[in-house]
């Protein structure tokens, strides 16, 4: 790591508004479809944003997927209600829009396609013929916006109950409970809800049996210890063999994206911790970075290193729980108790720095809540001296155990092609041999200044490989923390910028203008310039991202939260068909997910 962070060469600010006309893919699209076929939107997302006609969608998607360096992953797909948006200068007329975020691993570049829709014609062709993982994203977009995807294999609700009325992310849908009638659960309504939860195989294209025997349909969850949360998987069984299965999510849905439209840019920060409740400050990182792009804020070097330090502490904390519970799922109980001892040491350190444990809500727009306290370095030093020996003991006692290896090697295995098709990120993707970690591929918060390695598998992602990669990731996080300890820069813990929220306290106590700004930003919220921004990070479970749209207000016009666990659970049927029920338990333990991350 660079010892003097202030000597770094100045880079182009991440928050510049750009149209990316110099990106090669824009030229490739214009050569194929003509120079006037698209509208290119200038944003602060950091990726080309191209509006295309609905009739061109599948053709453009197919073209991008077949380029010499193809766009092989559908990273995200969702919608937006454009009807109340006032700042749309130069954009096609639209009541609603759908966006498609594609990634090219070979180019290390993205592109975002947008389709404009009229309120009286909310139809767009399904993308599932090109990218199978579009299935759940299209279901969610229909569920929350009412946009129909023609040709979808089973367009039904996924987040809301099947009996729900309306589409919650529309602007005319109430955001507060007080705008609804009081909730009542009559016996008739309870019976209706229970009937809606009854699984009907025919609705999913499943047969109830063959000529010789019937299949069993079994509910695993939504209350089952191996489901790791409120999560149901309906299994179609031939004996103990899984013929097919249907993951059923949404039981933990809290309307996190809708809340983003009602909270100020500042007051939404505590909600980000709870998207994936084990990640703590890791979840705050993409949100505050995306807001800082909108605001045009470049934070001090000290802030970057503090943020990295807290993020890596929470990464270790999450990985320890994942590894120990995986071992427990396979059948060994003891390691999980030892891991909680280690995690307590991390919580003691986090609490000393932030004042909180699991959900600090400590990152701020333009910095962090306060400076590091006295003695933080001693606590971190003690943890760094403690953890490597403990990690070695886990590996020797449990992870190298022949029974565990035999139980997990070759189970739920898939290759690079399948991982990319299903939008898999994190250790699941890297286990297939693809070296893609956002901290290295697209550094943020100063990660480019740290010396660490990215563990990569040998070509097949199975349960054992995924776990062992996480073990090595733990070692690399310890390596990063060592550099944070030895090279913490001096300087302020907040940026000197009008939109830093709250403003630095020293000025608030001395200048009436800053005091007024503090009052307005905390009570009403800071006003962000009208624009769009995007930030992805390498979170604990894969790639997490925030796509924010500002209409020049104190609140976000649209907050899109893309989480890795949502994509990973959609892959379950493809990875587990033909396996045993006991293999499914091992597979679920190896994914590393929590349902809050799935359902938001």
Swiss-Prot record:
Catalytic reactions on record: a quinone + NADH + 5 H(+)(in) = a quinol + NAD(+) + 4 H(+)(out)
Biological role: NDH-1 shuttles electrons from NADH, via FMN and iron-sulfur (Fe-S) centers, to quinones in the respiratory chain. The immediate electron acceptor for the enzyme in this species is believed to be ubiquinone. Couples the redox reaction to proton translocation (for every two electrons transferred, four hydrogen ions are translocated across the cytoplasmic membrane), and thus conserves the redox energy in a proton gradient.
Protein's name in the database: NADH-quinone oxidoreductase subunit C/D
Entries under Gene3D superfamilies matching the protein: Cytochrome-c3 Hydrogenase, chain B (1.10.645.10), NADH:ubiquinone oxidoreductase, 30kDa subunit (3.30.460.80)
Enzyme class, first EC level, given as a word: translocase
Sequence segments annotated as region (NADH dehydrogenase I subunit C): 1-190
MF (Gene Ontology): NAD binding; NADH dehydrogenase (ubiquinone) activity; NADH:ubiquinone reductase (non-electrogenic) activity; quinone binding
């Amino acid at each position: 790591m660079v010892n003097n962070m202030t000597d770094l060469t100045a880079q182009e600010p991440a928050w510049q508004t750009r149209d990316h006309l110099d990106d090669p893919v824009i030229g490739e699209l214009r050569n194929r479809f003509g120079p006037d076929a698209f509208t290119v939107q200038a944003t602060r997302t950091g990726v080309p944003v191209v509006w295309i006609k609905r009739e061109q969608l599948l053709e453009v998607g197919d073209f991008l997927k077949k380029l010499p360096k193809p766009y092989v992953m559908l990273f995200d797909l969702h919608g937006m209600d454009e009807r109340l948006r006032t700042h749309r200068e130069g954009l096609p007329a639209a009541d609603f829009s759908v966006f498609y975020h594609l990634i090219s691993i070979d180019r290390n570049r993205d592109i975002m396609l947008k389709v404009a829709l009229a309120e009286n014609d909310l139809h767009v062709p399904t993308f599932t013929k090109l990218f199978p993982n579009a299935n759940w994203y299209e279901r969610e977009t229909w569920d929350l916006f009412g946009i129909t995807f023609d040709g979808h294999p089973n367009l039904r609700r996924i987040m809301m109950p099947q009996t729900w009325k309306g589409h919650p992310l529309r602007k005319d849908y109430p955001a507060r409970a007080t705008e609804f009638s009081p909730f009542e659960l009559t016996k008739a309504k309870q019976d209706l809800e229970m009937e809606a939860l009854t699984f009907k195989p025919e609705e999913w294209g499943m047969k109830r049996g063959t000529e010789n025997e019937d299949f069993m349909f079994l509910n695993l969850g939504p209350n089952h210890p191996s489901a790791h949360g409120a999560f149901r998987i309906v299994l179609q069984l031939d004996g103990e063999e899984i013929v097919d299965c249907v993951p059923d999510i949404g039981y933990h849905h809290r309307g996190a994206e809708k809340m983003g439209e009602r909270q100020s840019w500042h007051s939404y920060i505590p909600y980000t911790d709870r998207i994936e409740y084990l990640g703590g400050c890791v979840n705050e990182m993409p949100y505050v970075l995306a807001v800082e792009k909108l605001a045009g804020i470049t934070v001090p070097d000290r802030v970057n290193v503090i943020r990295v330090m807290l993020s890596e502490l929470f990464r270790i904390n999450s990985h320890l729980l994942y590894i120990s519970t995986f071992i427990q799922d396979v059948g060994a109980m003891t390691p999980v108790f030892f891991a909680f001892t280690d995690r307590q040491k991390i919580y003691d350190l986090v609490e000393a720095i932030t004042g909180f444990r699991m959900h600090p809500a400590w990152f701020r727009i333009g910095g962090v809540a306060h400076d590091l306290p006295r003695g933080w370095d001693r606590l971190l030093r003690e943890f760094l001296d403690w953890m490597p020996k403990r990690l070695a003991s886990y590996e020797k006692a449990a992870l190298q155990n022949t029974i565990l290896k035999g139980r997990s090697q070759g189970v739920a295995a898939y290759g690079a092609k399948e991982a990319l098709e299903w939008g898999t990120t994190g250790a699941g993707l890297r286990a297939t041999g693809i070296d893609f970690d956002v901290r290295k591929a697209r550094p943020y918060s100063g990660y480019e200044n740290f010396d660490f390695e990215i563990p990569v598998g040998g070509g097949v992602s199975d349960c054992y490989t995924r776990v062992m990669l996480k073990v090595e990731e733990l070692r690399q996080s310890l390596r990063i923390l060592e550099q944070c300890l030895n090279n913490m820069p001096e300087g302020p813990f907040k940026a000197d910028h009008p939109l830093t929220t709250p403003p630095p306290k020293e000025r608030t106590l001395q200048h009436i203008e800053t005091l007024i700004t503090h009052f307005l930003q905390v009570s009403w919220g800071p006003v962000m310039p009208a624009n769009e921004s995007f930030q992805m990070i390498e979170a604990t479970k894969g790639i997490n991202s925030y796509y924010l749209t500002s209409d020049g207000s104190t609140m976000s016009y649209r907050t899109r939260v893309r989480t890795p666990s949502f994509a990973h659970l959609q892959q379950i049927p493809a990875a587990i068909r033909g396996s045993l029920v006991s293999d499914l338990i091992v597979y679920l333990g190896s994914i590393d997910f929590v349902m809050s991350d799935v359902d938001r």
